[in-house]
Regions:
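Leucine-biased recognition of intrinsically disordered, low-complexity hydrophobic segments
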Residues: 6, 32-34, 39-40
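A glycine-biased, small/acidic residue-tolerant capping/turn segment at secondary-structure junctions
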Residues: 769-786
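Extended, well-ordered protein cores
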Residues: 70-338, 347-570, 575, 579-597, ...
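Residue-identity detector for glycine
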Residues: 10, 15, 38, 49-51, ...
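Short, charged, amphipathic alpha-helical segments
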Residues: 751-759
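C-terminal accessory extensions/subdomains outside the catalytic/core fold
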Residues: 788-810
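Tryptophan (W) side chains
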Residues: 19-25
Length: 810
C-alpha cells in the first residue's frame, strides 16, 4: 500500500505500468534501474477499475517472482500490507531505498494487503491491466528456500465485516469482483465463497512462517522505556475485575491427543444420530512424529456460561466484556462471538427471530450486523426495534465499549476486540475498560476456553495484590514460540467445523482405524490441530540457543493436565538431551505457574524467557511488551526460517485502524515505525552474513547506531497534532543514519556520499520539520481505506519538498 512505482508483473513481468501517476523521483530512479536490468518494459497506461483512476497497489515494487528474484543483486522483499503500517511505508520506503541502493542491495515490495489478496484471487473477473500477481504464494514458496529475506509488516486478518467492506470498496473502484455469496448453493457460488473464505482470518502468517519465533525487546528499546516510562494505571486491592472461563464443555476439557508412529493420513467424519456418515474433510496428510489433537466446544455449555457471567456482572455492577480472536480463529471464534450476541440480546432475538431471519442477520458478524440490517426498514419499524435495544441495555449489565462516542460496544464487530491486544490494554489500565460514558470501570472479562484464560487471571491477580508494574525497573520476558508450519490452533481453520446435527465426530486413519471420537450436539464447534516434529525440534533448539545467549531462565509454558501439552513435554524433554544445557536453567511449568513465576521475576527486575506454543506466543508477545514498553510494536521479531532464510516481522502488534482514522481526520499519523527500523537492521545483518556483502553489514551497524540515537533523542511519534508524527520520525532516522555513515571510516566512498546527505538534512532540519508540521491539523483524502489512491497517499505521506529533494540528490 505504498508507491514504489514499478511494473505490476504477471507471469513474466507483464501488465500495465501506471504512467498516469507514478513518475515521481523514486519511480523514475527505480524504474530506470529495473529497465537496465531487463526486468521492465514500457507498457500501456494503467487503469483503475473501468475508469482512469490509478490502482492503489498497482505501483508496488515487484521484482521477479520465484526464480525471477534477482540472483545478481542481493534482495530484501518488503511487504505492502494494510492500514497504518502501509501508510507509513509511503514515507519510509523511499528513505530505505536511498540507503540500501548505495550498498548494492535491492529492496523490492510485494503486495500482500487484504485488497491485493482479493484481487489476486479473482483474475478472471478483472481486465489485464487490473490483475495483480499472487504475491503471497510467491513469498510462501520463497520462505522455504535458503535465500529468503523478507520483512513482514502487520496486515489485516480480515473478519467477515472487513472482507465485505473491502470487496465493496474495490467494486466501487471499478473492479468487477463477485459479491460474497453468503448462502452459496450453485457450484460456481460455492467456488467463489471458498476463494473468499481463504482470504479471511490469518491467511498470511501461516504461509510465511516456515520457522519458529524469536521475539524480544532490544536493549536500546528497553533502556528507552526505562528513561521514558509510559503511563500505567494504578491497581486497587479491591478491584472487581476478573477473568471468567468455562469449567466444563470447552476445548480444554475435551482434548484428545496422539503422536503419529508413521506417516499417513486421516479422514474427519460426522456420524449423525441415524447413522448417516458425512465426510467433513477427506484427507489430512500426517508425518511420522507429528502431534495431532482434537477437541470440541459445546455450544449449549458456552451459551450457559455467557448467561451466568452476564448475570454475575449485573450483580457485581461491573462491565461485561468478551475477549476472543475472531480474526485468527476465523471459524471457531466468530461462532463463539455470535453466541454471546444472542445471549446478551436474548429478549431482542426472541421477539424478532422471524424478522432477523428474513433480513439475513448473521450474529457471527456481531451486533453491528443487526443495526446494519434494520437500517433499511421503514422508520416506524426501525424505531420500535431501537426502543427494544435500549430496553436490553437497561436490563443487562453495561457492555465494555470500543468507542463510547459512537456507541460501538464490545459485541458490535468481532474484529474490534482482539484478546491479545484488549487484555493487555485493560491490565495496563488498572484492569478496567471504558463504559458508555467514556469512563473506566472494572470488568468481568469472559474468555470462554480454559486453555489460556488462566494466564490472564494470574496477571490480574498479581497486579491486584502487588500493584501495577513500574516500567523503569521491571524485567523483560522475550519469547521463543512454536509456530512453524501452521502449528497448533493457528493451523486448525481447515479442520474446524460447526456440527450440523447430534451424533459423533470421529477421525479415522488410512486403514479405517479409529483415532479420535467425540459425542457432539448440533451447533458444537469441533476442531483438529497439528504440530509437526521438525518444528518442535527446532523450537527446542532455539530455546536452548536463547537461554545460552542470555543466561536467563527458559520456561516451557506447558500444562501437564492437557493431552497436547503432555505430548510436547515428552518431545521437549527428549530433544533437550541433544543439546548442551549445562549451566542453563530450563523449566517446565503450567501456563498459570509460568505466569506467576515470570511476573514475580519481572517485578524484581529480573528476566525470564517464555518458551510457548503458537497461541501463547501471540498472547505473551503483546502482554509483556505492552507492560514493559507501552506497545508491542517495538519488539524485535525474528523468524529464523528452517531452510536457512530469514523472516523479519515488524513488532508484534496489529495494523492500528484507529491510527488511520486519526490520520484521515487530522492529518496526523501516530504509527511508530521503530519495529520496521529494527527489522531492517536485522534483515541487513542477515543478508550480509549470507552474501558477504560488507556494505550491507555496514548499513546494519550504522542503522543500529541510528536507532539507538533515535530512541535516546526521543524522536518517536507522539499522539497529538502539533507534535512529531510518523513522518517526522522517518526524517530523524534518515538524519541519524546518514550521520552514522558519515562518521564511520570503514568505507570512504559511503562516508563521502552520506556526509553530503547528513549535512543537507542537518542544515535544513528546521525547514523540514516545519514542512512536515504544516501538513498536520486538517483532514486528508487518501481515496480509499483498503486500497487508497497512491498519488493522494504519497502526497500526504511525503509533504516535505526539502526532504524529498535531498534524497533525490543522493
Amino acid at each position: 500500500m505504498f508507491v514504489a512505482a514499478l511494473s505490476r508483473p504477471g507471469a513474466s513481468v507483464s501488465g500495465a505500468f501506471p504512467w498516469s501517476w507514478c513518475w515521481t523521483w523514486k519511480a523514475r530512479n527505480v524504474f530506470l534501474a529495473l529497465r537496465e536490468r531487463g526486468l521492465l518494459h514500457r507498457q500501456k497506461p494503467c487503469e483503475r477499475g473501468s475508469g482512469n483512476a490509478s490502482s492503489a497497489h498497482a505501483g508496488m515494487t515487484h521484482g521477479r517472482i520465484g526464480k525471477r528474484v534477482s540472483t545478481k543483486t542481493p534482495t530484501i522483499l518488503y511487504t505492502a500490507t494494510d492500514e497504518a503500517p502501509a501508510l507509513a511505508t509511503y514515507s519510509l520506503l523511499p528513505i530505505v531505498e536511498t540507503f540500501t541502493k548505495a550498498a548494492g542491495v535491492a529492496v523490492e515490495a510485494r503486495d500482500i494487503s487484504l485488497s491485493g489478496r482479493i484481487l489476486a484471487s479473482f483474475p478472471e473477473f478483472l481486465s489485464d491491466a487490473q490483475r495483480v500477481p499472487d504475491a503471497l504464494s510467491e513469498l510462501g514458496a520463497l520462505a522455504k528456500t535458503p535465500g529468503a529475506n523478507i520483512i513482514k509488516l502487520p496486515n489485516v486478518s480480515a473478519s467477515m465485516p472487513q472482507l465485505i467492506a473491502a470487496i465493496k470498496e474495490l467494486q466501487a473502484q471499478g473492479y468487477k469482483l463477485p459479491d460474497y455469496p453468503a448462502d452459496a448453493k450453485a457450484p460456481e457460488e460455492k467456488g467463489i465463497k471458498t476463494r473468499y473464505d481463504k482470504i479471511k482470518g490469518s491467511a498470511v502468517n501461516p504461509v510465511l512462517r516456515e520457522g519458529n519465533s524469536d521475539r524480544r525487546a532490544p536493549l536500546s528499546v528497553k533502556q528507552y522505556a526505562r528513561k521514558h516510562p509510559h503511563s500505567m494505571g494504578a491497581w486497587s486491592k479491591t478491584s472487581k475485575t476478573r477473568i471468567s472461563h468455562m469449567d466444563e464443555g470447552d476445548f480444554y476439557g475435551s482434548e484428545k491427543s496422539v503422536t503419529m508412529d508413521a506417516a499417513g493420513f486421516v479422514r474427519i467424519e460426522h456420524i449423525a444420530a441415524d447413522g448417516t456418515v458425512t465426510v467433513l474433510k477427506e484427507k489430512t496428510p500426517l508425518l511420522a512424529g507429528e502431534v495431532i489433537d482434537a477437541s470440541v466446544m459445546s455450544y449449549r455449555a458456552l451459551a450457559a456460561f455467557y448467561a451466568a457471567q452476564i448475570e454475575e456482572a449485573r450483580k457485581n455492577k461491573v462491565l461485561v466484556s468478551l475477549h476472543l480472536k475472531a480474526t485468527m480463529m476465523k471459524v471457531s471464534d466468530p461462532i463463539m462471538f455470535g453466541c454471546a450476541v444472542e445471549v446478551y440480546y436474548k429478549d431482542l432475538f426472541a421477539k424478532y427471530a422471524a424478522l432477523f431471519a428474513e433480513l439475513g442477520v448473521d450474529v457471527r458478524n456481531g451486533f453491528g450486523d443487526v443495526e446494519a440490517k434494520i437500517a433499511k426498514l421503514p422508520p416506524e419499524q426501525k424505531a420500535a426495534i431501537e426502543a427494544d435495544i435500549k430496553a436490553v441495555y437497561k436490563s443487562q449489565p453495561e457492555l465494555a465499549m470500543v468507542n463510547s462516542d459512537k456507541g460501538i460496544t464490545n459485541l458490535h464487530v468481532p474484529s474490534d476486540i482482539i484478546i491479545d491486544a484488549s487484555m493487555p490494554a485493560a491490565i495496563r489500565t488498572s484492569g478496567q475498560m471504558y463504559g458508555w460514558d467514556g469512563k473506566l470501570y472494572d470488568t468481568n472479562a469472559m474468555i470462554p476456553d480454559r486453555c489460556y484464560a488462566g494466564v490472564y487471571q494470574e496477571t490480574v491477580r498479581f497486579c491486584r495484590e502487588n500493584g501495577a508494574f513500574d516500567p523503569t525497573t521491571m524485567g523483560s520476558c522475550p519469547n521463543v514460540g512454536l509456530m512453524a508450519q501452521s502449528a497448533e490452533e493457528y493451523g486448525s481453520h481447515d479442520k474446524t467445523f460447526q456440527v450440523p446435527s447430534d451424533g459423533k465426530v470421529r477421525v479415522v486413519d488410512q486403514d479405517g482405524k479409529l483415532v479420535f471420537e467425540h459425542a457432539v450436539e448440533k451447533g458444537d464447534i469441533w476442531r483438529m490441530c497439528q504440530a509437526k516434529d521438525a518444528p518442535i525440534r527446532d523450537w527446542v533448539k532455539l530455546a536452548v540457543t536463547r537461554a545460552r545467549a542470555t543466561g536467563w531462565p527458559a520456561v516451557f509454558w506447558l500444562d501437564p493436565k492437557r493431552p497436547h501439552d503432555v505430548a510436547l513435554i515428552k518431545k521437549a524433554e527428549t530433544y533437550l538431551k541433544d543439546h548442551d544445557t549445562s549451566g542453563l536453567t530450563i523449566l517446565f511449568k503450567s501456563p498459570e505457574e509460568a505466569a506467576r513465576y515470570t511476573l514475580e521475576r519481572l517485578k524484581k527486575g529480573e528476566n525470564a524467557i517464555s518458551v510457548t506454543g503458537n497461541v501463547l506466543r501471540d498472547y505473551l508477545t503483546d502482554l509483556f511488551p505492552i507492560l514493559e514498553l507501552g506497545t508491542s510494536a517495538k519488539m524485535l521479531s525474528i523468524v529464523p526460517l528452517m531452510n536457512g532464510g530469514g523472516l523479519f516481522e515488524t513488532g508484534a502488534g496489529g495494523s492500528a485502524p484507529k491510527h488511520v482514522q486519526q490520520f484521515v481526520e487530522e492529518g496526523y499519523l501516530r504509527w511508530d515505525s521503530l519495529g520496521e527500523f529494527l527489522a531492517l537492521a536485522a534483515s541487513l545483518e542477515h543478508l550480509a552474513g549470507v552474501t558477504g556483502n560488507k556494505r550491507a553489514k555496514l548499513l546494519a551497524d550504522t542503522l543500529d547506531q541510528a536507532n539507538a540515537r533515535f530512541l535516546e533523542s526521543d524522536k518517536s511519534p507522539k499522539r497529538k497534532v502539533g507534535e512529531i508524527d510518523n513522518r517526522g520520525s522517518h526524517f530523524y532516522l534518515a538524519l541519524y543514519w546518514a550521520d552514522a555513515l558519515a562518521q564511520q571510516n570503514d568505507d570512504p566512498e559511503l562516508k563521502a556520499r552520506f556526509a553530503k546527505l547528513a549535512k543537507v538534512l542537518g542544515d535544513n532540519e528546521a525547514k523540514i520539520v516545519a514542512e512536515l508540521a504544516a501538513a498536520q491539523g486538517k483532514p486528508v483524502d487518501i481515496g480509499g481505506y483498503y486500497r487508497p489512491d497512491p498519488a493522494k497517499t504519497e502526497k500526504a505521506m511525503r509533504p516535505s519538498a526539502t526532504l524529498n529533494a535531498a534524497l533525490l540528490a543522493l
